Amino acid sequence: MATVNQLVRKPRKSKVEKSDSVALQGCPQRRGVCTRVYTTTPKKPNSALRKVCRVRLTNGYEVSSYIGGEGHNLQEHSVVLIRGGRVKDLPGVRYHTVRGTLDTAGVQDRKQRRSKYGAKRPK
C-alpha cells in the first residue's frame, strides 16, 4: 500500500482500455475499396466456405472483412462500408461489411432480421 506522500509525488495510473477494432479509429463505420474477394475455411470444429474480402480503407488501413448473408455481389474495386465485429471462427477477420449500402446489395428474399442484411420489407 502506498503512503499519502508517495501518492502525492506520483499518482496512480488509470488503465487504458484497448479497442477491438483499431482500424475504425473510433468511428462507427468506415468506407473502403475491395482489393480481393475470396472464401476461406473456419477453425476446427467448424466446416464451411466463409465469404471474406480484403478492404483498403479511406484512412489507409487494409483489413479483412466478413460478408454475411447468403450470396453477394462484391468483386474487386467494389466500394463497401465496414463495421466492427469479429468472426469467432475466422482468425484475423475483425470486421463485417454492411449489407445494403454503397456497392453491397442486400440479401435477396430475406424475411426475418432484415435490417441486419439490408433487405427491404416484402410486399
Curated annotation (Swiss-Prot):
Region (Disordered): 1-22, 103-123
Sequence ranges of Basic residues compositional bias: 111-123
UniProt GO cellular component terms: small ribosomal subunit
The keyword DNA damage belongs to this UniProt entry's keyword annotation: no
Residues found modified as 3-methylthioaspartic acid: D89
Any one GO biological process: translation
Keywords of the record: Methylation, Ribonucleoprotein, Ribosomal protein, RNA-binding, rRNA-binding, tRNA-binding
Pfam families, alphabetized: Ribosom_S12_S23
Molecular function, one GO term: rRNA binding
InterPro entries: NA-bd_OB-fold, Ribosomal_uS12, Ribosomal_uS12_bac
Keyword rRNA-binding: yes
Function: With S4 and S5 plays an important role in translational accuracy. Interacts with and stabilizes bases of the 16S rRNA that are involved in tRNA selection in the A site and with the mRNA backbone. Located at the interface of the 30S and 50S subunits, it traverses the body of the 30S subunit contacting proteins on the other side and probably holding the rRNA structure together. The combined cluster of proteins S8, S12 and S17 appears to hold together the shoulder and platform of the 30S subunit.
Assembly, per entry: Part of the 30S ribosomal subunit. Contacts proteins S8 and S17. May interact with IF1 in the 30S initiation complex.
Entry's family note: Belongs to the universal ribosomal protein uS12 family.
UniProt protein name: Small ribosomal subunit protein uS12
